[in-house]
Amino acid sequence: MCGKRWVGLTLAAATVVAVSGCHTAFGPEPLDRDWRVYEGVRVSFFVRPGSFAEQNVARLSEVLEDQFTSTVATLRLAYAGHLHAYAYNSGAEAHFTSDAAGRAYPETESFRFVAVPPMGDNLFQLMSHEANHVVVIDGLGRAGTYFMTEGLASALLSETFHRSGRHFLFPWTRSHRAQLPRMATLIDDGGWGRTAQDTAYKSSASFLAWLIDTYGSDRLRQIYPLNSDQMLDRIASIYGRPLDALEAEWLVFCENFAG
């Protein structure tokens, strides 16, 4: 189905030499030897032999290559690194509490995630979210808030292969309007921590996706590194509108979004 489009994706080695001394702050735990690596242009994909991920590595790699290109273009990044994606067979194997989980390690341009059936939007979204953490942090440095760190990774989702980006976020905002926290609450790290995780992630992603679409990424880059207090103080001068006005404009847009 996509073999001709992936002539550049090659099996580099049957096994990967174990890596020692990796701390979780800088990369995945020390690797065992039971991996196969498939090399792409911008992504090296590590999979378990015979796994669901290996059976679908061409499409998974295609999604990540597209996401890499999209994120760099949207944020106008100079980043030209190479990602290392580790696909685990279960949350337990990756030391996560569920199968819907991943973790990024920007210092080593790597991330790990759980790849389980079905092949589709949820898996692509999870994988792309973690990849975006690496690309964004290595391209811009670390964000000043949880709001920006987690929200932007989903706000930047390319929809070439799925509809888990804007076509999900804006209708979700409309249907959950009564439960939405204020953006000022999410920008504050304390308020973020008191908000249900799913609501915090989706609300912030929706707002930031709209902000990029409406006002461009250059202004967003200015608020990206600011801490909670700085962002709340400076967002009006950077955007020419106070946060409350931006939030109201976003909600009207989502209410009228037709896809």
Question: Where on the chain are the PLM-derived regions?
Answer:
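Bacterial N-terminal signal peptides that target proteins for export
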Residues: 1-10
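C-terminal motif of bacterial Sec signal peptides marking the signal peptidase cleavage site
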Residues: 18-21
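Bacterial signal peptide processing site
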Residues: 23-25
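Juxtacatalytic substrate-recognition/specificity segment
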Residues: 27-145, 231-233
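Acidic/His/Gly-enriched intrinsically disordered linker/tail segments
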Residues: 99-111, 122, 139-259
